[in-house]
Amino acid sequence: SSPNGLARKEFIKNRAGNYLVVDNQSGEVRGTAPTTIGYRGSVVVTGPPTQLSTNADNGTTYDIKSWFSFSSSSLYSLIQNNFPRFHNLIRQAGLSQDAYNRYSFISDNEIYTVFAPTDSVLNIWLADTTLTTAQMKQFCLMHFVQGKMIFTDGRQSPGYYETLRRDETSTEFITVYSKVYIEPGIDLIHFPDKSGGDYIDINESGATNRIAGINLGTGDEVFANTISNAVVHAVNRVFEHGLMDTR
């Protein structure tokens, strides 16, 4: 796909399983890590690419001068470093495998969107809330959407998206996951409440669209073999299943 220029930033998946970040304000195009002079270079460069082709029937070619770089920070590390209170709550719920630096409910064969509450929001909410371990688990998993990477560029359609929360309609033999209604828009992601009002708007900022990845290699490769598997957005309200538009 190609950028349409509507959002401040657009996220275009490449053939290697990573994302190119298109800044429609500055014109810069980069990978999920800063662009450098030379592969894995120390000098960071910015700037728009130069279009070379104008009449191709299956794409457009650009000259970028420097090397795109792609981060392989894991979802576990990203949440641990940027949302320590949420990370610790996941651990308390028994959902982490700390010895392996991973969450037990995350699969390397799936993609995710995570709406991670900030430390301040969680501290305020938890001050007046007591959770059992089972409730804590359900609460944490409500913030994970599986099967889609939703950015603030409006490329996904509005609809009910499957979370990792085990729904009450599940049985001993069948697991049903709760779904939450999401309206991806231009420079924001909107969540209605159960009455059709506003629950939360997540506006594009430096605290949104943080991309995590998986390193498929040993770490000794000249060219890193990584793919993107999750995007994380900071949220200033916790996700409460009973208050949101869910099914």
Map each language-model feature to its residues:
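Mature, structured domains of secreted/extracytosolic soluble proteins
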Residues: 1-247
